[in-house]
Amino acid sequence: MINTKALRQEQIAKAQQVICYDDFSPPKLIAGADVGFERQGAITRAAIAVLSYPALELVEYQIARIETTLPYIPGLLSFREYPALMAAWQLLKYKPDLVMVDGHGIAHPRRLGVASHFGLLANVPTIGVAKRRLCGESELLGEQPGSCQPLLDKEEQIGWVWRSKKRCNPLYISTGHRISLDSALLWVERCMKGYRLPETTRWADGIASNRPFFEQMIQKNP
């Protein structure tokens, strides 16, 4: 039986170790990380795509598949996802200076989403780039690209609600580890190329999902 109380207590303890200020040099390699599931959840799949900066060209990618170690439990998703992320991380020849994770960082009820959890374990600066809100509230967001509002939870800012593209739902940007909230938003902005997602997590999602466009791009950039 899974001791969810112990896992929540572990989250609270690990959240105290998260560094919420800039602790990195200007990155030359920036990665995106994405996690999915296969065989009705029996297999966890993690993809990490490493891009050069500022060109944002693919340098390396790795995919790891492992047996799923934990069922889906709301608020404890990082325990389900980090083992595959760490497996993919270990496969990388070129370790990135900054990683954007498809998921939340400190924008989490106990301030430890998958971006923060992975950042702590890998000791790498990370940013949470999530497609859906997990907790917190914000003021009404403008429709124009670049519109931004603080994401607040009990008067504490835990992230940004940021509209990256017109007529698209916003992204939820947060500190993962070793980066400030302001810098997290800045670096996501710097990795945009006109799509809803930054190139980092767009590549990771495309590779993990075997999308035809990314397969063609990989063939051109072996």
Curated annotation (Swiss-Prot):
It is an enzyme of class 3 (hydrolase). Its main location: cytoplasm. The keyword Magnesium applies. GO terms for cellular component: cytoplasm. Its cofactor is Mg(2+). Its EC number is 3.1.21.7. This is Endonuclease V. It comes from Photorhabdus laumondii subsp. laumondii (strain DSM 15139 / CIP 105565 / TT01). The gene is nfi.
